[in-house]
Amino acid sequence: MGQQISDQTQLVLNKLPEKVAKHVMLVRESGSLTYEEFLGRVAELNDVTAKVASGQEKHLLFEVQPGSDSSAFWKVVVRVVCTKINKSSGIVEASRIMNLYQFIQLYKDITSQAAGVLAQSSTSEDADENSASVTSCQASLWMGRVKQLTDEEECCICMDGRADLILPCAHSFCQKCIDKWSDRHRNCPICRLQMTGANESWVVSDAPTEDDMANYILNMADEAGQPHRP
């Protein structure tokens, strides 16, 4: 029965637009991810990025933000800090914070890319030289991907409109989608967190300040070149 459901789900996913199908798969994966598996992926990213950027001037460090994983609802509030560090000086050049959904996207991107780079380096005698030229700025390239993931907030419902409304649970939506939903519901469409009071209703995120983002659990990272202060 389980396999049948899985096959049916795959058939449905095959008919969806690629972007929507990818979103559905990421949501399903984050929903089934255990805490131990999550920690394992954080450790794996540290190992993989260290191997690919071996011999390079900069490297990335991934770590769970202290205290963000202590809640029973850790999947909603957990944050992963990604830091770019200069190996020779030890200076933190950039730091950004990701939620679980963003981290899973980055995990898939990096592990997929790294597998190709490492496979190439193991099958070609000239790979060291070629790989060095390609990955000399690998940490910076990956940090750019982190910035892209944390900067581009899309509506969690339609995956098309830009998210301009944020709930206290950190899920974000476009005005059109959330207006339709809130006509009949008083909870988050994604995690079902109840909005109990009028002042807990949909929060406009127009030109948010750093304090605003912290208050709504966005936890966006510091701008490039500024160290993260936990």
Curated annotation (Swiss-Prot):
Gene symbol of the encoding locus: RNF141
Gene Ontology annotations for the cellular component aspect, listed alphabetically: membrane
Q: What does this protein do?
A: May be involved in spermatogenesis.
Q: Which cysteines are joined by disulfide bonds?
A: none
What is the protein name given in its UniProt record?
Answer: RING finger protein 141
- What are the protein's GO molecular function terms? ubiquitin-protein transferase activity; zinc ion binding
Gene3D superfamilies in UniProt? Zinc/RING finger domain, C3HC4 (zinc finger)
Give the species this sequence originates from.
Answer: Bos taurus
Zinc fingers (RING-type) by residue: 155-192
Residues with covalent lipid (N-myristoyl glycine) sit at G2
